Amino acid sequence: MATMTVQEQGDAQEGVGAGGVPVEVAASYRARTRGLLGRDGIDGALMITPCNSVHTFRMRFAIDVAYLDKEFRVVDVVTMKPGRLGMIRPRARHVLEAEAGAMAGWGLRPGVRVALRP
């Protein structure tokens, strides 16, 4: 489990609480394939890497999806309802998934940088 903070022009802005946002990292093929399928929600976010597109087939809840480039800068943020296929983002190398509405509260928007720490 890692912790995420949002950085804007070199200044760190903490996410949820003083410790940032808890992030699960899905880097293996099996973990990337499973993603958030079968869950009723998530506390924090899930980072899928490498990844540049997602779907919400068989999902039980709507999610926010942030596409990150190789430097962890946000390329795009979208909200997806269950049963949708997201567009491929060629510049994206990583994807963050969270419950719908969470990313706006964390300050995630195109152009900001995400920092992960153990």
What is each residue range found by the language model?
Residues 1-118:
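Compact, glycine-rich, soluble single-domain proteins
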